[in-house]
């Protein structure tokens, strides 16, 4: 399977994964959805780094990674709206998107640096996979939307 074919399969499954994630985000706790989406994304990246890159292995990766590729957006938008209000959700998500781009640039630079040192992208895939799993656990630390905020009281 060529890189272009793999990316095409990812894109096709991304379409369905994102729509399904939107449907799920209207019905379930978005923190748990993000936990599963980031966790499965991390496992997909680690799987890719350990695979033999055969047609079947790349197809399995492309399907699972595609289903999850943009699936984090609907629950993230819902959490932003719940925390900051619907009128500010767009602004907040814009900042999240900007931060995402800075992270992507840093990750691309880091992957290139690792490639030049190790002559392979495998360490970069494994680090990205582990970071996704850390993100999955971190999402569970978010306060459940609709619960009261703790406000310090004067003594």
What name fits each language-model region?
Residues 24-25, 110-119:
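Interfacial helix-cap and linker-helix signal at transmembrane-aqueous boundaries
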Residues 32-47:
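Structural signature of the two symmetry-related core transmembrane helices
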Residues 71-84:
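Intracellular juxtamembrane helix-capping segments at the cytosolic ends
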Residues 1-12, 91, 95, 123:
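Loop-to-transmembrane helix entry
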Residues 57-71:
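Hydrophobic core of transmembrane alpha-helices in multi-pass small-molecule transporters
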């Amino acid at each position: 399977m060529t890189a272009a074919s793999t990316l095409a399969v990812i894109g096709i499954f991304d379409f369905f994964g994102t729509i399904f994630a939107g449907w799920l985000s209207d019905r379930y706790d978005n923190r748990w959805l993000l936990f599963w989406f980031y966790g499965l994304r991390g496992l997909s990246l680690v799987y890719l780094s350990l695979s033999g890159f055969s047609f079947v292995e790349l197809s399995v990766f492309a399907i699972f990674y595609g289903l999850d590729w943009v699936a984090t957006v609907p629950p993230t938008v819902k959490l932003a709206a719940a925390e900051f209000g619907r009128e500010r959700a767009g602004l907040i998500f814009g900042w999240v998107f900007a931060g995402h781009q800075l992270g992507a640039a840093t990750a691309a630079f880091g992957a290139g640096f690792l490639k030049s040192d190790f002559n392979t992208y495998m360490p970069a895939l494994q680090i990205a996979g582990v970071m996704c799993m850390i993100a999955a656990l971190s999402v569970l630390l978010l306060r459940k939307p609709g619960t009261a905020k703790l406000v310090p009281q004067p003594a």
